[in-house]
Amino acid sequence: TGVQADVAVYFPDNISKLYQLTQWLPVFENHPNDLTFAIVIRNIHTFNFLQGKTSLPLAHVPNFSDVMNLYRVSPFKAVVYVNNGVANFQSLTVPELAHIHINHGESDKVCMVSNQAKAYDRVFVAGEAAVQRHRAALSEFNVDLLVRVGRPQLDEHPSPSISESSRTTV
């Protein structure tokens, strides 16, 4: 059966990379527009770990054929990617959907400006510095595909991960 959402957030990786997704969950859960999101997970351990940790629907699709079937029967209009995992390229085979790379942060690391950016319909970046990094590092890359969005996950105000204490934190 399909998942009722406008946007699929594709995450094929194991729990060790879950930080790449979890920083975006509040943004997807509290999206200011009427867009709805669902998390598409390939790894069963990641799927089990996320149960009850998000209000978004979760879909476990372990195999390529499962991913293709989910995309076929769901009303998704776009797929969002939070990293450059090699398994993203299986999801990218669906031409009817818009494929958007949002990454999990920005830095001067090579992976922030790899040729993988050319595979996506749009690449969301924090700002002009990211645009300049792409322009300088990639040949034959259309910087018009870069969309400046800031860092929306920083607009969320998560609860502190450490309990309140009278002790000084350094």
Please provide the spans of the model-predicted regions.
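Short, conserved loop/helix-junction motifs that constitute active-site signature segments
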Residues: 28-31, 90-96, 114-119, 140-141, ...
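A short, charged/proline- and glycine-enriched loop
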Residues: 2-7, 95-97, 164-170
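Short active-site oxyanion
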Residues: 33-37, 77, 118-123
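A nucleotide-sugar donor-handling region in carbohydrate enzymes
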Residues: 116-170
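Helix N-cap/beta->alpha junction signal
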Residues: 13-14, 43, 83-85, 126-129, ...
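Extended catalytic core of nucleotide-activated donor transferases of GT-like folds
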Residues: 45-116
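Short N-terminal or domain-adjacent regulatory/targeting segments
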Residues: 1-5, 12-15, 104, 149-159
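N-terminal pre-catalytic "stem/leader" segment of glycosyltransferase-like enzymes
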Residues: 1-71
